[in-house]
Design a protein with these regions (language model features):
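Active-site acidic/histidine proton-transfer and metal-coordination neighborhood
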Residues: 1-71, 168
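Histidine-acidic metal/acid-base catalytic patches
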Residues: 22-25, 54-183
C-alpha cells in the first residue's frame, strides 16, 4: 500500500512527524492481522506536506513502533521537486548516499517513475512524460541500470491525456526499455 505521509497543517514539521508515526502505530495496532507493508511515498513538499526531506521519513521510522512494516516508494518527480538531484552521476550518487544515511537503502521497496514539469527544488508536484520534463532522460538511465534496484517494482505515473491519438503509456514504456543496458 503506497501512501503520502501527510501534512503538518500549521503545527510544525516535528509535531506532524510525531502525529504521522502515532497514526501508523494505530493502524498497525488495529490491523495487526494484516500482512500489508505500507510504503510512504517521497513527496514534493507542496504546502505543509511532509515527506519531502529524507530526514522526515527517517524520523517517522525511528518514532514508530513498527518500522519493520514500513518502506519507501521513491517518486522521481517528487524527489527532484523536493531538491534531490538525480543527475549527473555524481549528484545521483550523493542523493542515494543521503537516502541510505537518513532512511536506509533497505527501506526502498518501489519506484514511481515520472519526469517533472518543474525544476529542481521547486516543491511543485507536476508529473511529465519520461524525458519531456526538467529531469530529462539521464536519471531514468541511472535508476534502471542501478543493480541495487533491479528487483524493485517500478510504476509508470505519467500524465494521462484525454483525446490523445497515441498511447503515451506505450511511448513512455518504450523510452524506459530503450534505456536498459544489457549485461
Amino acid at each position: 500500500l503506497v501512501a503520502h505521509p501527510g501534512a503538518h497543517v500549521k503545527t510544525g514539521e516535528e509535531a506532524g512527524i510525531k502525529r504521522i508515526a502515532h497514526g501508523l502505530d494505530e493502524i498497525h495496532r488495529r490491523c495487526s492481522d494484516f500482512k500489508v507493508m505500507i510504503l510512504l511515498e517521497i513527496t514534493a513538499g507542496q504546502g505543509s506536506t511532509l515527506g519531502y526531506k529524507f530526514d522526515h521519513m527517517g524520523q517517522i521510522f525511528k518514532q514508530t513502533k513498527h518500522a519493520d512494516k514500513l518502506g519507501i516508494c521513491f517518486d522521481t518527480c517528487h524527489a527532484f521537486a523536493a531538491g534531490y538531484p538525480l543527475f549527473p552521476k555524481v549528484d545521483y550518487d550523493a542523493t542515494w548516499q543521503e537516502f541510505d544515511t537518513l532512511i536506509g537503502i533497505n527501506k526502498l521497496k518501489a519506484f514511481h517513475l515520472n519526469d517533472s514539469k518543474k525544476g529542481l527544488g521547486s516543491r511543485v508536484d507536476r508529473h511529465e512524460h519520461i524525458g519531456k520534463g526538467a529531469l530529462g532522460i539521464e536519471p531514468f538511465r541511472l535508476i534502471l541500470n542501478d543493480p541495487r534496484f533491479a528487483n524493485l517494482p517500478m510504476v509508470l505515473e505519467t500524465p494521462k491525456e484525454e483525446g490523445d491519438n497515441h498511447d503515451m503509456d506505450g511511448v513512455n514504456l518504450t523510452t524506459l526499455r530503450d534505456l536498459l543496458q544489457s549485461n
